[in-house]
Amino acid sequence: MKSIIESFNKINSNIKKLQQKNPVNIIAVSKTFPLAHIQPLIDYGHNHFGENKVQEAISKWSYIKKDNKKLNLHMIGKLQSNKAKDAVKIFDYIHSLDNQKLADILFKTQVNENKNLKYFIQVNIGNEFQKSGIPINELDAFYNYCTKEINLDIIG
């Protein structure tokens, strides 16, 4: 079985072969894996990790993030409004911003916590009711609200 470092290096090598104009950050999805499994990658110098559950992220990452300020934690799953306050405390990026209520909670909490997270708006381009994401016809208004009215740092 390949080590986590070997797998990381292979992925990184394949990305470099593509000769991208802009740098690419690999987000190692660490959900469900214990910290002991991920630690070699942290020790190797990788610093972007993705989790899809707030409580799992808190229990796994709270201690190690205090000692390693270079670690960046990405919330890659659906974020429920009732978990938003806790999410701001542990995550650096939210990849699933999809409604105004959530945006408002995240903004207020990041002000209270003196943090500045980076956000990706999740868009439901197929307008499928069973899927998350802001409908595409509401995207411009939502983006303007987030960036101009409450000043969230939308990066994607």
What label would you give each PLM region?
Residues M1-G156:
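Conserved alpha/beta-domain cores
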